[in-house]
Regions:
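Ferredoxin-type iron-sulfur electron-transfer modules in oxidoreductases and energy-metabolism complexes
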Residues: 1-9, 59-201
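A basic, amphipathic helix-loop patch mediating RNA/tRNA/ribosome contacts
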Residues: 1-30
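Short, surface-exposed helix-loop/turn micro-motifs enriched in polar/charged residues
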Residues: 13-17, 35, 137
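Mature cores of small secreted peptide/protein domains
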Residues: 22, 27-30, 48, 124, ...
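A generic, well-ordered mixed alpha/beta core segment in the N-terminal half of proteins
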Residues: 24-78
């Protein structure tokens, strides 16, 4: 209120969905990615999680690969470039939904692929990692395709290209501290990092 009263610009922050599905609301709240509640993003955090009169500290995510644009807004387009390096399949769907069920997929594989695909690319994994590693993000994006038969065609190129792009973007190396999994609002499992390493070998 004081900033606006003094004629300054309001504090800039990203937001979009208000449903915890886009990841654009990412920020530190009292030193924790997305705040003190587990399994939710900033936009889903309720003020009742804090006591009346509490001082709340908000900060942008910090990583060399996520430069600050203004105030709480960071540039997370490095994730987009990693996706562009291999986050696709080349099967021609041509809008023919009749073919959707022609490739049988085991339920366990489909469920794991779906779980990996729930990654919203918010960057909490990078922001909380002492190395600023994007390994959890990349492993989720690699695994969502690697677990399905449609993703097998580009499997080798996908993992090589996405890991290479991750390195080019300046993300750190994974040292298996597990902080990324703990702070991930979608609970992406460290098992996907193991899957990525298997695909990379």
């Amino acid at each position: 209120e004081k900033i606006m009263h003094d004629g300054g610009d309001p504090v800039a922050f990203d937001h979009d969905c208000r449903e915890g599905i886009c990841g654009s609301c990412s920020m530190f709240i009292n030193g924790q990615p997305h705040g003190p509640d587990r399994g939710v993003t900033t936009c889903q955090l309720h003020m009742r999680k804090f006591k009346d009169g509490d001082t709340i500290y908000i900060e942008p995510f910090r990583s060399r690969a996520f430069p600050i644009i203004k105030d709480l807004v960071v540039d997370r387009t490095a994730f987009d470039r990693i996706q562009q390096a291999g986050g696709y399949i080349s099967i021609n769907t041509s809008g023919n939904t009749l073919d959707a069920n022609t490739i049988p997929i085991e339920k366990e594989s489909a469920d794991k692929a779906f779980d990996a695909a729930t990654c919203i690319g918010c960057g909490a994994c990078v922001a909380t990692c002492k190395n600023s590693s994007a390994m959890l993000f990349v492993s989720a994006k690699v695994s969502q395709f690697a677990l399905l038969p449609q993703g097998k065609v580009e499997a080798t190129d996908r993992v090589l290209n996405m890991v290479k792009q991750m390195d080019l973007e300046g993300f750190g190396n994974c040292t298996n501290t597990g902080a990324c999994h703990v702070e991930c609002p979608k609970g992406i499992s460290l098992d996907y990092i193991a899957k990525l390493n298997t695909e990379y070998a």
